[in-house]
Every structure is written in C-alpha cells, then in structure tokens.
Amino acid sequence: MTIHIEKETEVNFDFNEEVLIKEVIEAALDYEECPYETEINVVLTNNEEIKEINKEYREIDAPTDVLSFPMVEFNEPSDFEHVEEEQEDCFHPDSGELMLGDIIVSVDKVFSQAKEFGHSEKRELGFLIAHSMLHLCGYDHMEEEEREVMEERQRAILDRIHLSR
C-alpha cells in the first residue's frame, strides 16, 4: 500500500497525524474488504486553499472540511469485483496498486470542528479520513438512507482503531 501525505500548511497536532491517517486508511480498506494493494494521496491544507479547490470543482465558494476525488467508478459501493475487468486503467502501471483517489483535508476545519463537536482533533481528523475513504470506495450521502449507511460504516471503522466519540 502506498499512502502519499502532503502538507501544504503548518500542522501542529499533539499526535502523529501521518500514523493516524495510515491507520484509518488501513482500517477502512480492511472494513470494506478491498482485495488490492492501493495507492491513496492525502493533502493537508488550510481553509483558503480548500475553498479554492471547492470553488473550482464543486462551484461552492466556501471552505469545507474534506474533499474526496475518487479515481474508481464503482457499480455499487465497494464492489471491487468488477474493478479489475472494467477499469484496468485505475491500476498503477508500475506498482500494480489500485489508485483509489485523493483526499484533501482542511487542518483549520479539523481544529474548529473538534472544538465545535467537543472531541479531540485526533478524532476529528480520523473521522474525516474515514468519511473520505468511504467516498473513494463509492459511497455517497445524497439520500437519507445513504447517509445512514455511511454514518454506520464510519462508526465501525473508527471503532476498529478505538477512535469513537
């Protein structure tokens, strides 16, 4: 598994964010029963930068906590069975890893939302990575039923690494 973590802003957590990010990604892939070695890119940025990206890709002129850019188009969430036969271009030509996608997190939002929701920055960052990983695996939350499924899966992933509320 390859996880690229890029820090575009100063990061001052009281925990090792790289260890946490890798732990959450591994827990999510395990929970979703991904049979492949994967490549995932994570960018830690600030509100200003994520606002620009949000405006460019979603036409929303405001900062957000996390953005997900999936590389794989699933028929059904986490339906890895059809990936190899239908989307061979999603595999890195050299490593053979499934290029799942990119996650962009606003560190500013991690701090403000942790305070707002009354939990630790570690829990907030873990939640945002778990949430984004589910998007990379084809989940969405446009409908109430989809939202409930995502919430349950997020909880289960965070429970696996003892990061519940």
Swiss-Prot record:
For the keyword Nuclease, the answer is yes
- Binding residues annotated for Zn(2+), in chain numbering: H131, H135, H141
Q: Which GO terms describe its molecular function?
A: metalloendopeptidase activity; RNA endonuclease activity; zinc ion binding
One of the Pfam families matching this protein, by short name: YbeY
Q: Please give the GO cellular component terms listed in this UniProt entry.
A: cytoplasm
What's its top-level EC category? hydrolase
Q: Where in the cell is it found?
A: Cytoplasm
Q: Which domain of life is it from?
A: Bacteria
Q: Which cofactor does it need?
A: Zn(2+)
User: What role is this protein assigned?
Assistant: Single strand-specific metallo-endoribonuclease involved in late-stage 70S ribosome quality control and in maturation of the 3' terminus of the 16S rRNA.
Q: What is this protein called?
A: Endoribonuclease YbeY
The organism encoding this protein is Lachnoclostridium phytofermentans (strain ATCC 700394 / DSM 18823 / ISDg) (Clostridium phytofermentans)
Q: Which gene encodes it?
A: ybeY
